[in-house]
């Protein structure tokens, strides 16, 4: 994600009203206030990716193998319930999801749509000022996920993020975020994607 867009999301998160803050607590995203202040160690992340074995799905450090299990991340985050692994479909129609999740009419959704996602700048510019709109909390959650937990393209939000929003109030998204992060490492190692998809913050932890 481009730095300018990330700064816009951070500014939006830091200036949210009571409705936005209540919704962040409801979907377990209150931590975003602190996460946005974490400085990424890019040298560390590049080094970590070099040690990732995309065939065996382990990190190789000398003769040691480290497999990042969900339970290990759960212990760090004090989470023990991993009943379901959430991997939303990646081929959903972004225009239909924009209408379903954010009540964006089809004619506008078609302008926002970008292949398998939609324009992140447009979402942030529209909803960061529309605090009275019914779907404002959901839009804020999408921006938080896109900016800090399910980072992907430089200016496009993947439909995975849209599809996950409907599950946030009843399911734990950590398994999905971890899965997307490890898949992102795979795609980088296999040269399938020029940028990393997933959570830089989770990987750094």
Label for each model-derived stretch:
Residues 1-186, 198:
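N-terminal leader regions that mediate targeting or early regulatory function
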Residues 188-191, 198-205:
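Amphipathic alpha-helical/coiled-coil segments positioned at domain termini
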